[in-house]
């Protein structure tokens, strides 16, 4: 089915509708799983020596110093244009503003007289950021990860990226307060962050995107007792656009293509109650596709993508919630009015002037988002991901005395005698003091 095929949702059977919303299959092959497991074990056992061997094998690079020096970072900064530095500064300012606003006030309540309960937040002590390499370095992800880590107060923030690390990544790391940067990529970088080596410190939590090997490595270390937590499950990038007859076809097409160019496994979907809009968007996609350097990648992604005509906007919202897109763009006359009906989406973009690119780079929201349907249970990355909540309780003698019989009754019902005794002993002590 080509992207030019216009699908009438209400002419499809329930089975066909489910198939239309299926994502491209993702699963790590047995060979990837085994290879990653071997890499993790090797790095854990052999440390820096294993990292250097894997860099030579996979990155075809001889790494003398794993840690990037301050001089190298300063030189990278000198090579960047002032225009790019200024653009990064604007983006960081907006990201700071939005994520600082996410700070939660402490909870401090008396649930009953003499029983005080609190909830306080503490930063995750150490975090590791993974940034992929390649021809198009994702320095914007450095901004999205390192900025909230700094605001949260994480004591140790380190970054790994495959050598040679792009100047943009090094400058972004410095700009956002990353303390150490390491010339390590792939699954071996995840292993180094999870277990620690002579050069790379072990961290409590790992953030960042990557290829199938990196994704599998993150999954595996998150399940090992001696490993590390991870940010969220990862999958191919995706966008769903809801548009009515008031939308601009060229705008819609550009948003669909900006997602499709990420990779051949990306998925884009258009939902519209207007068949003419669907046809106009399809034509605009073809026109714009011809001008893209990554046209072949985008075209492959479009093979698993959909143009769907619905009964009305309410049905568009219903289908979108069923799919739960990573990015949801609403280009309708009443875009803001539809938000209350949206229950599952990573990030929502309202109106003609809110392209996904704004959130990807500089509006202030985070571009690290749940994909592959995980929006049903996962949130977009935010300050809370770099923090942990801790509860505190304090009972006075009056509060304890009032609650004691309740606790004893509940503990006895669960046949946890020691729990009951911990209360009874204190009750008896109070009686003796009286």
Swiss-Prot record:
It comes from the Bacteria. Substrate binds at residues 237, 259, 262, 327, 360, 414, 419. Homodimer. This is Histidinol dehydrogenase. Its cofactor is Zn(2+). It is an enzyme of class 1 (oxidoreductase). Catalyzes the sequential NAD-dependent oxidations of L-histidinol to L-histidinaldehyde and then to L-histidine.
């Amino acid at each position: 089915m080509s992207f030019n095929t216009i699908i009438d949702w209400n002419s499809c059977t329930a089975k066909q509708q489910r198939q239309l919303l299926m994502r491209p299959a993702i699963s790590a092959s047995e060979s990837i799983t085994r290879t990653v497991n071997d890499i993790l074990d090797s790095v854990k056992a052999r440390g820096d020596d294993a990292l250097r061997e894997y860099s030579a094998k996979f990155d075809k690079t001889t790494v003398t110093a794993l840690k990037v020096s301050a001089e190298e970072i300063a030189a990278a900064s000198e090579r960047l244009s002032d225009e790019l530095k200024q653009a990064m500064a604007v983006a960081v300012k907006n990201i700071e503003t939005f994520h600082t606003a996410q700070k939660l006030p402490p909870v401090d309540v008396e649930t009953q007289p003499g029983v005080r309960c609190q909830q306080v937040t503490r930063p995750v002590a150490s975090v590791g950021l993974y940034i992929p390499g390649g021809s198009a370095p994702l320095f914007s992800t450095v901004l999205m990860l390192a900025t909230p880590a700094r605001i949260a107060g994480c004591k140790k923030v380190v970054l790994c990226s495959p050598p040679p690390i792009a100047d943009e990544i090094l400058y972004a790391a410095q700009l956002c307060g990353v303390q150490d940067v390491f010339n390590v990529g792939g699954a071996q970088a995840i292993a180094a962050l999870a277990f620690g080596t002579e050069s790379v410190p072990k961290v409590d939590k790992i953030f960042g995107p990557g290829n199938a090997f990196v994704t599998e490595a993150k999954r595996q270390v998150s399940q090992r007792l001696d490993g590390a937590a991870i940010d969220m499950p990862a999958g191919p990038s995706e966008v769903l656009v809801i548009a009515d007859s008031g939308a601009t076809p060229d705008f819609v097409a550009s948003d669909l293509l900006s997602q499709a160019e990420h990779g051949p496994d990306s998925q884009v979907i258009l939902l519209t109650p207007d068949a003419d809009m669907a046809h106009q968007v399809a034509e605009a996609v073809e026109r714009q596709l011809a001008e893209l350097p990554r046209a072949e990648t985008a075209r492959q992604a479009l093979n698993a993508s959909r143009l769907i005509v619905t009964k009305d906007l309410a049905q568009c919202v219903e289908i979108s919630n069923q799919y739960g897109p990573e990015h949801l763009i609403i280009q309708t006359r009443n875009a803001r009015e539809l938000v209350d009906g949206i229950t599952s989406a990573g990030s929502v973009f309202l109106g003609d002037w809110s392209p996904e690119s704004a959130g990807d780079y500089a509006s202030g929201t985070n571009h690290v988002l749940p994909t592959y349907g995980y929006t049903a249970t996962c949130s977009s990355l935010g300050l809370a991901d770099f923090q942990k909540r801790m509860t505190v309780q304090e009972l006075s003698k009056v509060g304890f005395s009032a609650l004691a019989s309740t606790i004893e009754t509940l503990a006895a019902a669960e046949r946890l005698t020691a729990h009951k005794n911990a209360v009874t002993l204190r009750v008896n002590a109070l009686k003796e003091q009286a």
